[in-house]
Amino acid sequence: LKADIIIVDLGAGISNNTLDFFNLSSRGIVVTNPEPNATQDAYFFLKNVLYRRMRLFAKINEPIKRAFDDYIDRNGNGMFDFGGFREFLNRHQQGARKEYNNFLNEFNPRLIVNKIRSIRQNGEGTWFINLVKTFLDIEMEYLGGLRFDKRITQSSEKLFPFIYHFPNARITKGLFSILSNLNGIDLPRHEIRTFKQFRTLLKEQQKQWH
């Protein structure tokens, strides 16, 4: 498939397949809305994605593996907390802390906030990015927000793209603004040309968990 960017809608959930597909992407995009339940789900999704990435990274990075195992042993309850792990590295594993920083710097997902209904909710994107930075040490990029528009539902019911029928609508202009930010210049190129190659890559990654 000849394309500069391919977008796959993974849907909601934190199944291993969803997490692995997200981790296979060059830079995953999280789409949420300002409702508390939605932002909470988005945060826990990113937390699970990061944890799965780190467990895989620990299998190929000995300092991180030792630090992770040591942290779990000292913690006593078998639970993992990113903030606690960060403090543990700062106190006991300075060498692994550098490796951990490099690992985090390679994960920069993007964010879109959908169904914004008020001026106050315009700040939800920045708030969420700051939350993720504080507790997960992840640097996210905010692609933009989209205002709530009931015409989206109408378009969906009639099975036609709203951008064609409402080209001057605020949400259409907002969508094109996001698309202008979604460039492929900084994205690594995948040397994958067929679905068979993609399926093979996914199976190889899944083997790492067994």
Identify the residue ranges that each predicted region occupies:
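Phosphate-binding/switch loop-helix module in NTP-utilizing enzymes
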Residues: 1-21
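Conserved Switch II/interswitch segment of TRAFAC-class P-loop GTPases
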Residues: 11-13, 26-63, 69, 76-87, ...
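Alpha-helical elements of the RecA-like P-loop NTPase motor core of helicases
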Residues: 16-19, 40, 154
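Alpha-helical scaffold elements adjacent to nucleotide-binding pockets in ATP/GTP-utilizing enzyme cores
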Residues: 20, 24, 41-45, 127-131
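C-terminal lobe/tail of nucleotide-utilizing enzymes
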Residues: 64-210
